[in-house]
């Protein structure tokens, strides 16, 4: 006679561990963040929580960090749920470090066997078991179980995981729970596996059930209404109170969870990372080889191959850094970065380190960074120190068009089993969340798209009723309200893993035993399942192999200058501190210049008036959220104004300049002055904050670095508050006034919004100066470099070309008889010796025209010129589509005449195929009327995105004048507060995070650019005009201060209809 199933646990709240839990890193399955699940398990008093995302360890570090923050007696188990191709579903839990490595490698095998976002594992992959891992067989959710098949599966798992396998009993408070429990206990008995309680949790709280339904519908590519039984029947797949579980599960099943926990000892803290060692030659140690390279680098830097002429201060810093690196064991890290930089330079690839690494004289000696230690701004503790609980971080920028060469070098040198890129977590933002929720709810696609197009990245809050009405939705409808609520809930959820912009992790042993590796979307790329924050949290080293478009533009520009001058010209040949460069920048003439071409930077330039290199360092750093929100900008500008008036800058002084009896107060009167003198008494950089904490508040250098880290975490975790009291007390003890102490704390808090290290700003300032010199002194080559390196920068080719022409650069159109693929320099006919070159636009600017076709044109033209379109098509093997694109761009004009004529010939002149291939077929030439100027403009913008003819608004000026619009040039001379109205093509839209909802527009007419400020209230009231207009009329009031002129918008009018078919696109929210 069969025994009755065990009764529920008699204890009201027995001890329990959840062994099967999915986070939202099981994409489109889990409905809670890892942090929420850990917090909920701790709150419910669980003994342990296992994070078991599907074929993934992507969420475990976040769970680990949350547990650290909570400091609660909850044990975190690491595992993964695997759904095999054969139908078996199993959860594996790692018991120790070796088992964790095997699990990570198994996940890697599954992920590498499939395309991005998928995995493929079979029973064969588990045939020998996974030593050290515990296995839970998870029955299907079917109401009627196939007992025989499940017994067979459970036995199979039990044989491969002897004494380490269980049958998971998951009950969901359904009407069949009793029958399901009885059946699962019988199956466990027949298979010889102990049963264990589990929830298969998808969310931390039942309130996430609606969101879980949305995710399930998205995964199945159906609406919620169509999903039917594929949706969970209730909200029970959550982390419940233990008392609830006690009523649901027999006591022995709950107790079994604790026996499993007792066998799991692995913690993520056990992960240890060793850097590659093969870069060290025989007979050398990492320390000795690094020292040799540094000594060679110092001699190279100082231009003396034999002697050591390093200044004593630099020599002392070298010895200090080498000792510190040796003590912390980071020699191999520096050697690896040096090897990548050496490879790049050997290939002629421009590169430069940046970030905190520019504080290191070792990085400078190795050629990784370019900031000269003689500048006197290096603070090595910002980069590496004994008290830092994190590894150093070296970021190196490479030319964006050639970075792939460096990436593939890493893969070749270390192998894919040891090197991979870090991940980036792509999260739902306002627009993507709205679209996906609306799709799951089955809302009308047309209305949904209208609403989605009106949402931007900054729309993180609830959808405003007026936006819903404009899209045709009723804001009072329960379904629409559900859309708004679920969209808000989904924003911030991970959507998928992408690849980091360049963060490489390279290991001495197998990387996939440290973290799973999967295929990236790009061919020949592999990505780990952890992102930058995960790596930092575990103290794992990475190298940032980053891409920077300006480096490509500089190399291309310098190559053109070299060719034009007939001798090599490099960055080292650019004259330093050229006065004409600073005059240009002080007039906000910086379109195309690295880092200082944005609206905010251009507004700052005439106020700051840079006159030397260090001014550029400040310029780069001061227009950042940290200094702005910390209130540093106006005090700094006021200090500069005092200097111009020969007035002194005051610095805070302690009231006890000498040590007292017990030695408590020992600051020197000029301590603060030495820190702040170069920024005129105002802290602009993170390093200055750290130095002030040391000299004014008594922090150790390591404590000061902890303060710096707390600045970065302030917005997320409020970690800065615990340092505030220490700062205030330390400064009071050293005799500084409370006013200065409070102001410094407020400024430090501002840095929580993102401020630059001084070393990073100095690295960027080098590129600012070089690009500014090229713009000022070699404008034609600079324009070519920028155009040949697109897409990059702040401005589209149209604005770059217009700006260069305003500076006197002659720009010649793209033509098949003269153009290469790239833009080139060309001597003008009858030009005098030494005259500036013109720019010949390249065929790459013709939208839709391919590089291979362009190279065939150049090769054929090199043999002999093209007499006509037919010959061009024949010899360059161009099809009708390619000829049509060239004709539409005006590139056939030298052979065919105007566009209509060219289009006619293109239609008839493509190279014959088949039996007629290579044959010359003569057709009569038609004579067509030339297109009007307006038609030419429309065609230019359609195929090129710009025009070399008159500006579109020049053709509309008469109409705009009747509407009483003035030009951009006219308002530059208007007095402050004068009412004005202008109309222009919208070239860019910006919304800085520090602007409190204000939007900044740049509009362009035939006379230049105008800056428009649209305050938050007007943005919401006239959202369609602000975000959708191509030709915008602005009614407003002038805001003028010196050379800086803005128009504060009061009313906006969309005049895009005046443009007709002309396509003018803007670069928005760059």
UniProtKB/Swiss-Prot annotation:
A GO CC annotation given for this chain: cytoplasm
Keyword set includes DNA repair: yes
Key words of the record: Cytoplasm, DNA damage, DNA repair, DNA replication, DNA-directed DNA polymerase, Nucleotidyltransferase, Transferase
This protein's record includes keyword DNA damage: yes
Catalytic reaction equation(s): DNA(n) + a 2'-deoxyribonucleoside 5'-triphosphate = DNA(n+1) + diphosphate
EC primary class: transferase
EC number: 2.7.7.7
Gene Ontology terms for molecular function: 3'-5' exonuclease activity; DNA-directed DNA polymerase activity
Disulfide bonds: none
Location within or outside the cell: Cytoplasm
GO BP annotations listed: DNA repair; DNA replication
Source organism, top-level taxon: Bacteria
Family: Belongs to the DNA polymerase type-C family. DnaE2 subfamily.
Biological function: DNA polymerase involved in damage-induced mutagenesis and translesion synthesis (TLS). It is not the major replicative DNA polymerase.
Protein name (database record): Error-prone DNA polymerase
């Amino acid at each position: 006679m069969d025994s009755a199933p065990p009764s529920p646990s008699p204890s009201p709240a027995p001890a329990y561990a959840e062994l099967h839990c999915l986070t939202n890193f099981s994409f489109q399955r889990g409905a809670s963040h890892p942090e929420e699940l850990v917090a909920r398990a701790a709150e419910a008093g669980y003994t342990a929580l296992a994070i078991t995302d599907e074929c993934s360890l992507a969420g475990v570090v976040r769970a680990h960090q949350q547990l650290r923050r909570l400091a609660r007696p909850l044990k975190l188990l690491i595992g993964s749920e695997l759904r095999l191709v054969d139908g078996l579903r199993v959860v594996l839990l790692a018991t120790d470090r070796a088992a964790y490595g095997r699990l990570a490698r198994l996940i890697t095998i599954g992920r590498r066997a499939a395309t991005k976002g998928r995995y493929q594992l079979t029973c064969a992959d588990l045939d020998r078991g996974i030593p050290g891992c515990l296995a839970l067989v998870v029955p299907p959710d079917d109401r009627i179980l196939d007992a025989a098949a499940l017994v067979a599966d459970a036995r199979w798992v039990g044989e491969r995981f002897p004494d380490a396998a269980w049958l998971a009993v998951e009950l969901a408070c359904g009407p069949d729970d009793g029958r399901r429990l009885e059946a699962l206990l019988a199956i466990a008995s027949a298979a010889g596996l102990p049963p264990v309680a589990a929830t298969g949790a998808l969310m931390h709280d039942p309130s996430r059930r609606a969101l879980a339904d949305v995710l399930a519908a998205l995964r199945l590519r159906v609406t919620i209404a169509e999903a039917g039984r594929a949706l969970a029947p209730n909200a029970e797949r959550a982390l419940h109170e233990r008392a609830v579980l006690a009523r649901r599960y027999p006591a022995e099943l709950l107790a079994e969870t604790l026996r499993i926990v007792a066998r799991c000892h692995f913690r993520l803290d056990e992960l240890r990372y060793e850097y590659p060692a093969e870069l060290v030659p025989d007979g050398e140690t990492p320390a000795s080889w690094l020292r040799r390279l540094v000594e060679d680098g110092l001699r190279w830097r100082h231009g003396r191959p034999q002697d050591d002429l390093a200044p004593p201060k630099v020599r002392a810093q070298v010895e200090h850094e080498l000792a510190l690196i040796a003590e912390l064991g980071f020699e191999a890290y520096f050697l690896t970065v040096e090897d990548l930089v050496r490879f790049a330079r050997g290939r002629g690839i421009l590169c430069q380190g940046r970030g905190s690494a520019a504080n290191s004289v070792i990085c400078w000696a190795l050629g990784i960074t370019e900031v000269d230690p003689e500048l006197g701004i290096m603070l090595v503790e910002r980069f590496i120190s004994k008290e830092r609980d994190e590894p150093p971080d070296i970021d190196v920028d490479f030319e964006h068009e050639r970075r792939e060469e460096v990436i593939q070098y890493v893969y070749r040198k270390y192998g894919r089993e040891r090197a991979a890129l870090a991940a980036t977590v792509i999260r739902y933002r306002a627009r993507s969340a709205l679209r996906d929720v609306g799709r799951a709810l089955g809302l009308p696609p047309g209305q949904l798209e209208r609403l989605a197009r009106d949402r931007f990245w900054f729309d993180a809050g609830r959808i405003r009723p007026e936006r819903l009405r404009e899209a045709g939705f009723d804001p009072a409808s329960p379904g629409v309200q559900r859309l708004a609520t679920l969209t808000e809930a989904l924003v911030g959820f991970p959507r998928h893993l992408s690849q980091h912009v360049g963060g490489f992790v390279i290991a001495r042993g197998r990387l996939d035993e440290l973290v799973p590796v999967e295929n990236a979307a790009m061919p020949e790329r592999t990505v780990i399942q952890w992102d930058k924050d995960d790596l930092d949290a575990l103290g794992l080293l990475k190298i940032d192999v980053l891409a920077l478009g300006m480096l490509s533009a500089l190399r291309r520009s310098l190559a053109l200058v070299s060719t034009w001058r007939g001798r090599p010209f490099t960055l080292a040949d650019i004259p330093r501190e050229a006065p004409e460069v600073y005059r240009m920048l002080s007039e906000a003439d910086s379109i195309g210049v690295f880092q200082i071409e944005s609206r905010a930077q251009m507004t700052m330039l005439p106020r700051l008036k840079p006159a030397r290199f260090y001014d550029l360092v400040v310029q780069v750093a001061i227009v950042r959220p940290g200094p702005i929100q910390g209130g540093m900008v106006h005090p700094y500008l006021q200090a500069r104004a005092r200097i111009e008036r020969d007035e002194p800058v005051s610095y805070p002084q302690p009231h006890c300049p000498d040590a007292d009896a017990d030695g408590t107060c020992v600051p020197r009167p000029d301590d603060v002055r030495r820190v702040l003198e170069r920024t005129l008494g105002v802290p602009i950089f993170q390093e200055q904050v750290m130095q002030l904490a040391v000299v004014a508040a008594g922090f150790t250098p390591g404590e000061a670095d902890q303060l710096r880290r707390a600045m970065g975490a302030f917005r997320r975790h409020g970690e800065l508050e615990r340092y505030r009291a220490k700062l205030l007390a330390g400064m009071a003890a050293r005799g500084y006034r409370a006013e200065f102490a409070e102001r410094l704390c407020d400024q430090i808090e501002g840095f929580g919004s993102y401020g630059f290290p001084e070393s990073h700003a100095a690295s960027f300032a080098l590129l600012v100066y070089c690009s500014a010199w090229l713009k000022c002194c070699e404008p034609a080559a600079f324009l070519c470099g920028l155009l040949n390196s697109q897409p990059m920068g702040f401005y589209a080719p149209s604005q770059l070309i217009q700006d260069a022409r305003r500076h006197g650069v002659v720009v010649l159109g793209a033509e098949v008889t003269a153009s290469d693929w790239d833009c080139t320099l060309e001597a003008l006919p009858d030009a005098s010796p030494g005259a500036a070159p013109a720019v010949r636009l390249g065929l790459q600017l013709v939208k839709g025209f391919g590089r291979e076709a362009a190279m065939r044109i150049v090769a054929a033209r090199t043999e002999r010129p093209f007499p006509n379109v037919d010959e061009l098509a024949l010899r360059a093997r161009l099809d009708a589509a390619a000829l049509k694109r060239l004709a539409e761009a005006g590139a056939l004009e030298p052979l065919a005449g105007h566009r209509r004529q060219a289009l006619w010939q293109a239609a008839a002149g493509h190279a014959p195929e088949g039996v007629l291939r290579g044959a010359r077929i003569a057709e009569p030439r038609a004579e067509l009327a030339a297109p009007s100027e307006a038609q030419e403009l429309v065609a230019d913008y359609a195929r090129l995105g710009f025009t070399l003819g008159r500006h579109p608004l020049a053709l509309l000026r008469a109409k705009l004048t009747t509407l009483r619009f003035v030009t951009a040039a006219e308002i530059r001379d208007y007095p402050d507060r004068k009412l004005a109205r202008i109309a222009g093509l919208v070239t860019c839209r910006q919304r800085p995070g520090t602007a409190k909802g204000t939007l900044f527009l740049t509009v362009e007419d035939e006379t230049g650019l105008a800056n428009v400020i649209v305050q938050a209230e007007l943005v919401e009231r006239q959202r369609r005009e602000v975000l959708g207009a191509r030709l915008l009329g602005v009614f407003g009031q002038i805001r003028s201060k010196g050379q800086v002129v803005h128009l504060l918008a009061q009313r906006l009018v969309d005049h895009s209809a005046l443009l007709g078919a002309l396509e003018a696109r803007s670069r928005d929210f760059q």
